[in-house]
Amino acid sequence: SRGLGDVYKRQVKYHIDVAEGQKTGFFLDQKYNRLAIQKLCKDAKVLDCFTYIGTFALNAGIAGAQSVLGVDASQFAVDLANENSKFNGLENTVKFECHDVFDFLPELEAQGELFDMVILDPPAFTKSRASIKNAIKGYREINMRGMKLVKDGGYLATCSCSHFMDYDTFTKTIGQAAKLVHKRLRQVEFRTQAADHPISVSYTHLTLPTT
């Protein structure tokens, strides 16, 4: 059975499932980072990858985005995200689809799709120091695929929740990804998890525009 509840964060309302959902149904570490993207989303076309229940996507919609597409590999999460879109009266603007993000981004590229903002908030690619090399490959690849979909002058909001992916390693990996897809990046904001989560220097959040 589903353990449904409602959460209200500033202007956005969420249906969550505390019984079946990940991390008690809601990722509180990202709560202020979701608010931070709002100032960049007015009239924007936004792609939110690994959207889960749509938290970043809904904040983009509330901020006045022209259109938002949220993507997640879990049909359970996508169904709840679409419920949340209706819950906030955003169903005509904020839509969610079930896809494997790694496979779906090249499909969007092949279709000639471009976005004003691409959000990447993948699950941890490593939970041990021993597998950090594979994690670096994963972050480099997903950021390459995401960057290809950002319009010139647009924004890439990219996140890592891998404890062993420290700031220097992550930024170097993002830089490598940009070089490989011939993009120039400028960091406009660096953010971490909310203050009610223990701060680790290994945990990084970046917001980058690409041209």
Question: Residue ranges of each PLM-predicted region?
Answer:
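S-adenosyl-L-methionine
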Residues: 79-113
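Conserved SAM-binding loop of SAM-dependent methyltransferases across substrates and taxa
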Residues: 55-64
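Short glycine-dipeptide loop
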Residues: 150-154
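Mobile active-site "lid"/loop adjacent to the S-adenosyl-L-methionine
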Residues: 117-145
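SAM-dependent Rossmann-like transferase core, predominantly class I methyltransferases
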Residues: 6-44
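Conserved small/polar residues in nucleotide/adenosyl-binding loops
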Residues: 2-11, 204-210
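C-terminal catalytic and target-recognition region of SAM-dependent MTase-like enzymes
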Residues: 141, 155-208
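Conserved SAM-binding motif I beta-strand of class I
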Residues: 67-72
